[in-house]
Amino acid sequence: MDLRKKIRIIDDFPKKGISFKDVTPILKDPKSMKHTTKEITKYLEDKNIDVIVGPEARGFLFGILVAQELDLGFVPVRKPGKLPFKTFSVDYALEYGLDRLEIHSDSIEKGQNVAVVDDLLATGGTVLGVTKLVEKIGGNVSALSFVIELTNLNGRDKLKGYNVQSLVKYDDL
């Protein structure tokens, strides 16, 4: 299945010059959603994963599907102030400044193997923040999987030493 045909391109969103890659048509179509889940699952099957982590918000959508398929738990990583229990946090670099991510303090046990699932790898800032957060609380990041990768933004370069999968690659913004 060619997932590229299911990704909607929206020019000049969220700002002029950006060509937004919208994954919601994949989620709307059961066959595309199932195919995406299966492709990520196949990649992760031999990596001895204990838990799936997904960053807010679209990482939740794909991460939950993959976790369910692999019969694993799912852990959300959120922006500050969104999780009700004790959290660990990490600051991470954005193109212009810093942001923060949080995870529940009891969500990953020391030594657990973690796969991070998200919709998009762009500059790598968010996923690098997620990996630091997982490692900070004792997890091992065994794999990273993305539906889309924007190769011209070189996010993969920040992820050396990690197993990285992307299903669809674009070389434009």
Swiss-Prot record:
NCBIfam families: apt, PRK02304.1-2, PRK02304.1-3, PRK02304.1-5, PRK12560.1. It comes from the Archaea. Its EC number is 2.4.2.7. Homodimer. This is Adenine phosphoribosyltransferase. One of its GO terms (cellular component) is cytoplasm. GO terms for biological process: adenine salvage; AMP salvage; purine ribonucleoside salvage. InterPro entries: Ade_phspho_trans, PRibTrfase_dom, PRTase-like, UPRTase/APRTase. It catalyses: AMP + diphosphate = 5-phospho-alpha-D-ribose 1-diphosphate + adenine. The gene is apt2. Keywords: Cytoplasm, Glycosyltransferase, Purine salvage, Transferase.
